[in-house]
Design a protein with these regions (language model features):
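Extracytoplasmic/secretory soluble proteins
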Residues: 5, 9, 21-521
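N-terminal hydrophobic targeting signals that begin at the initiator methionine
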Residues: 1-2
């Protein structure tokens, strides 16, 4: 244990001058209870829990920090946002992906006066461990807004050069590939031929998506689009120019390919309504042979596989004349999930920072990543944590990932330690998946700051709300055949123009230029 903690301490001292900062003594002496709103982490259900307040990890955080929390969890981000907008008094803190789920993103929250500025001087005094870790360009470039200020505490933070940022992609039933005599496909032709061969082998619906929005996300994340000369179907940059894939001419070929899969029964006609329980059952029983989804689910799926079944991570699909794909899913170094806002109504800012900071202390980091020593993990002979049988072979039949997330605080803010991620993804299929999913040009094309400049926010929001809905509707109609790709695609582009898509592009380009200029300073 001492060896491992010494390593953590060394890392902390390298990343920030810890000795120059204040030190918070835990447990904090206070009778104040903080209020936090957050979307429910559904993964804890696989660990036997229905609310985070009952999990060992959350209880340990409150106990060890000395700060009690009244936690309100929401089924989804929409419910959380509606409650925020309708609240007479906001909670002390709230955590969610504002860039994705709030109108106008972080800039919208600022404009609506929902949040407080996070002052560096306050962090130095009340969150010194967090500040020592985060105060580096690789992280600060992501969390600092154009005005040079911070308005939230970071969500999940990856260690530098972590392959675990790339945690979504294609995975295959290896036993089915073996049965049809095929390798894991890399090119779009190999991918299509593999799906056809699976269908001929008796696989009812070869390609499924983990959840009902994941066909959309598969394309937005560039999983298949490189083969058609398109980075992705969402926003990206190329040589400093902002693009939106679903407004590019190459999008027509992407849609034609997806319609071909739909027409030939290679994807489900119910993809828009299929829940994960259904897609999981299909994949695990051999009714499907390929899934687009999360790496962490592989652990859960392994226990449900039919006898003789096996899995392997796939490549991000590209064209025959490409060495690798242009894009893939990847989290930023500081992820957008569970970024933590201190609300405008909060009267206990110092205490909020102290609670948050605890997750960056040596003790708090261990709880956040591994849980309770002696229960969910022990320190091995190599000085590193290792899961106990409670996690690896849970006596109540709960999944490894579900128990790990319940005893630790993995889906809460903090450092995603590489050792923890390796422990939770130990299967060869998962290791291979991370290697393959990270072999793309993602970081060349990703738009780090997606929120538009304040002066354009209202105009952009008015335009984008309807445009985004129209793009989603047309995608589904093109794939199903309700709209003709050959006859209606040009009209689709023209409609986007009439709705103001060119103006959206102008606003986003102005924003991208401003962010790139700020980063260059």
């Amino acid at each position: 244990m001492k060896k491992f903690l010494a390593t953590l301490l060394t890392l902390c001292m390298v990343l920030g001058a810890c000795s120059a900062l204040a030190e918070v003594t835990y447990p904090v002496e206070t009778s104040t209870t903080l209020t936090i709103w957050k979307q429910l982490d559904g993964s804890i259900a696989d660990g036997g829990y229905t609310t985070s307040m009952d999990t060992p990890g959350f209880k340990a955080w409150c106990e060890k920090s000395g700060i009690q929390v009244e936690l309100k969890e929401f089924a989804d981000a929409t419910s959380l946002v509606l409650s925020l907008n309708g609240a007479t008094t906001l909670p002390d803190m709230f955590m969610f992906n504002a860039g994705r789920d709030y109108n106008g993103g972080v800039a919208g929250l600022i404009a609506d006066e929902m949040v407080q500025v996070i002052e560096p001087a306050m962090l130095e005094q009340y969150a010194p461990d967090y500040w020592a870790y985060i105060n580096k360009p690789i992280y600060m470039n992501e969390i600092t807004q154009l005005d040079g200020k911070m308005y939230y505490l970071a969500g999940h933070i990856f260690e530098e050069k972590s392959p675990y940022r790339y945690w979504r992609g294609l995975f295959y039933r290896q036993d089915i590939l073996d049965a049809i005599g095929r390798d894991v496909p890399q090119t779009i032709d190999e991918f299509y031929d593999t799906l056809v061969a699976m269908k001929e082998h008796g696989v009812e619906t070869p390609f499924v998506f983990q959840g009902k929005t994941d066909l959309r996300d598969c394309l937005k994340n560039g999983e298949l689009t490189s083969a058609f000369g398109l980075v992705n179907t969402a926003e990206y940059q190329a040589d400093g120019q902002w693009h939106f894939g679903a407004y590019e001419p190459e999008y027509k070929d992407v849609l034609a390919f997806m319609k071909k899969l739909y027409d030939e029964g290679l994807i489900s006609v119910d993809y828009l309504s299929m829940e994960e329980a259904t897609s999981r059952a299909m994949f695990c029983t051999g009714e499907a042979g390929v899934m687009y989804g999360n790496n962490s689910r592989l652990n859960t799926y392994l226990s449900s596989l039919e006898e003789g079944g096996s899995m392997v991570g796939g490549h991000v699909i590209h064209a025959a004349d490409q060495d690798h794909a242009m894009f893939s899913y990847a989290d930023p170094m500081t992820t957008s999930d569970d970024i933590t806002f201190i609300s405008a109504d909060c009267k206990n800012v110092e205490l909020c920072m102290e609670l948050y900071n605890y997750l960056y202390t040596e003790e708090g980091n261990m709880i956040r990543n591994y849980g309770i020593e002696g229960e969910s993990y022990t320190i091995g002979e190599n000085g590193k944590p290792q899961y106990t049988d409670l996690v690896l072979h849970n006596p109540d039949g709960h999944s490894m990932d579900g128990v790990a997330r319940s005893y630790a605080l993995i889906n809460w803010p903090g450092i995603h330690a590489n050792d923890q991620l390796a422990m939770r993804h130990p299967e060869d299929s998962q290791i291979v998946a991370y290697e393959r999913w990270s072999n793309t040009d993602h970081d060349e094309h990703v738009v780090i700051h997606t929120a538009v400049l304040d002066e354009y926010l209202d105009e952009y929001t008015d335009l984008w709300t309807d445009i985004n809905l129209y793009i989603d509707e047309c995608r589904a109609k093109f794939i199903s055949g309700e709209m003709s790709i050959e006859n209606d695609f040009d009209a689709y582009i023209d409609t986007l123009k009439s709705m103001g898509m060119d103006r959206v592009c102008e606003i986003k380009q102005i924003t991208l230029d401003a962010h790139n200029a700020a980063l260059a300073e």
